[in-house]
Amino acid sequence: MRNGLATLATLATLVLVAAGCLAGASALAEPLSCGVVLMHGKWGMPQSPYLKPVVQKLEPTCQVKLLEMPWSRWRLYDKPYADAQAQIRQAVSEFRQSGVQWVAVGGQSFGANASLAYMAQVGDADAVLPMAPGHVPENFYLISDVRRGIDAAQQAVQAGQGDTLVDMTDMNQGQRRQVKASAAALWSYFDPQGLGNMALSARSFRKPVPVFWAIGTLDPLYPSGSAAIYQQLPAHADSQYLVVQANHANTPEAASEALWLWVKARTGR
């Protein structure tokens, strides 16, 4: 009888232990709530048609914030790059304050550039999602009519006249546009060795985080520097470099399915 009671007690203990293990496993497997801050490209807007397929894929899984950045078609560098970084930081903070556990920053073209700069300057995101990264000030400086404006902005800043308005030729995928903005703002974006330099940002991440990098075979950056910039990033086992058959504009759409699966894998959703 005593042996029988001992056996029952042992079985009961095993059942309780097993139940505890299952409960622990369930807790560990609980999906992370997730939020994604997405930024449009140069001269674009928050409701970018290029980002729309990505938003549609992500929204059933994650909350998405779409920001209007200082390089939008209406703002045209009305604030320096540091202000853009503060804007991203505010969006990330809002997610955190609402209880979101996993927060990524990303975007298309200039928005991708900003996500890299953000991790170098602030570094509090859990992942980075650069798609068709763009805005390459070190290359723009080689173009004479663009360089004139950049030099004028730099000279004004060095003279303590950062509020001076400067006329400059801006470039976007071969298109030119005349812009006028403060010297301080223009220099912050177009300094060849400044925040807009993606290779410098990549090697300056404040911490290693997983990066989902998407580039199209028809994107000008694909043969000229995309992989080299990616290789500057701190190594992370979950990072992915995805090449898609697409141009600069439709790379996010071509990568949207892979991005969605990648985010789900990171968050357990």
Can you name each region flagged by the protein language model?
Residues 31-59, 69-70:
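Short, surface-exposed "cap/lid" segments of acyl-processing enzymes
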Residues 205-207, 213-215:
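Short beta-strand/loop motif that positions the catalytic acidic residue
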